[in-house]
Regions:
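Internal, well-folded beta-alpha domain core
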Residues: 98-158
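Context-gated lysine
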Residues: 42, 60, 69-75, 80-83, ...
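Acidic-enriched, low-complexity/disordered segments with a strong bias for Aspartate over Glutamate
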Residues: 43, 51, 77-79, 85-87, ...
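A broadly used, surface-exposed interaction patch
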Residues: 63-106
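Aromatic-enriched hydrophobic runs in primary sequence
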Residues: 22, 26, 82-84, 92, ...
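N-terminal ordered "arm"
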Residues: 2-73
C-alpha cells in the first residue's frame, strides 16, 4: 500500500451551513478529488493504481468575514431585494480558506511505482487543473509519495 500526500490551499470555499455539508468539502468531493488524482497518475504513467480511499487533513481553517446575499428561493424575494425592501429574505454567505493535505491511498505494482516516482513533478503540475466546487484550489508545494505505508500512519506524521 502506498500513500500520496497532496498539499492543498483552497480559498473562497463556501462554508455556509446546509443540509448536505456544514463548513467542509463533502466526503464525496474528497473521494472524487483523490480518484481524479489517481486518474491523472494513470494517464501520465500508464500505471493502473487501485484506489484505497482518500482523506482530507485540515491544518488551518480561516473563516472570512461574511456578507449577506439575497436568497435564491423565490422570484418574489429577488424582486424585494431589487426594490430595497427590508422584508427581503437574506442569507449569510460564509467563505473560508482551508490549508492542509489530501491523503490518497493506493495499491500499485513496483514498475508503476517507479513510473510515478519518475514523473512526480509532472503529476504535481497536472493536479493544478483539478478543483473543488465553489472555491479556488492550489497545490502550494511538492507532492510526497510514501512507499510501503501499509496502515497509512506515516502520512499523518508529516
Amino acid at each position: 500500500m502506498n500513500t500520496l500526500i497532496i498539499p492543498i490551499l483552497a480559498s473562497n470555499v463556501n462554508v455556509g451551513p446546509s443540509l448536505h455539508a456544514v463548513g467542509l468539502p463533502s466526503s464525496n468531493a474528497i473521494t472524487g478529488f483523490g480518484h481524479a488524482a489517481l486518474r491523472v497518475i494513470k494517464d501520465m504513467t500508464g500505471a493502473n493504481p487501485s484506489d484505497q480511499g482518500s482523506a482530507l487533513v485540515i491544518n488551518k481553517y480561516t473563516l472570512l468575514p461574511g456578507r449577506q446575499k439575497p436568497q435564491k428561493a423565490s422570484k418574489g424575494d429577488m424582486d424585494k431585494v431589487k426594490k430595497g425592501d427590508l422584508d427581503a429574505s437574506l442569507s449569510d454567505e460564509r467563505l473560508a480558506v482551508i490549508e492542509g493535505w489530501v491523503v490518497v491511498r493506493f495499491g500499485i505494482g513496483l514498475s508503476g511505482l517507479t513510473s510515478i516516482q519518475d514523473k512526480l513533478s509532472e503529476i504535481w503540475e497536472q493536479l493544478h487543473r483539478l478543483a473543488f466546487a465553489g472555491g479556488v484550489l492550489s497545490i502550494p508545494s511538492k507532492l510526497i509519495l510514501l512507499e510501503g505505508d501499509e496502515d497509512g500512519s506515516e502520512a499523518f506524521k508529516k
